[in-house]
Amino acid sequence: MAVKLKLTRLGSKKHPFYRVVAATDETRRDGRPLEFLGYYNPMTDPVEVKLDADKIKEWLARGAEPTDTVRALIKKHMA
């Protein structure tokens, strides 16, 4: 059971809002996550991102692999 850090989509049509979650690689995009780690709102100006650095570092230490988009968010907003 590999764990990935990925985005789940919320919000209405054409107004996306995403949660950053830890979920197994077999879990559907909007399936039940293991833990919520933050959120990403691309519709605001500037873009609103809130990440729980402690939880993300804990999951990365356990071997969780972030998706490309989540990796970019971590790199940009946790640096």
UniProtKB/Swiss-Prot annotation:
Keywords: Ribonucleoprotein, Ribosomal protein. The keyword Nucleotide-binding does not apply. Coiled coil: none annotated. GO terms for biological process: translation. It comes from the Bacteria. Belongs to the bacterial ribosomal protein bS16 family. GO terms for molecular function: structural constituent of ribosome. GO terms for cellular component: cytoplasm; small ribosomal subunit. This is Small ribosomal subunit protein bS16. The keyword Ribosomal protein applies.
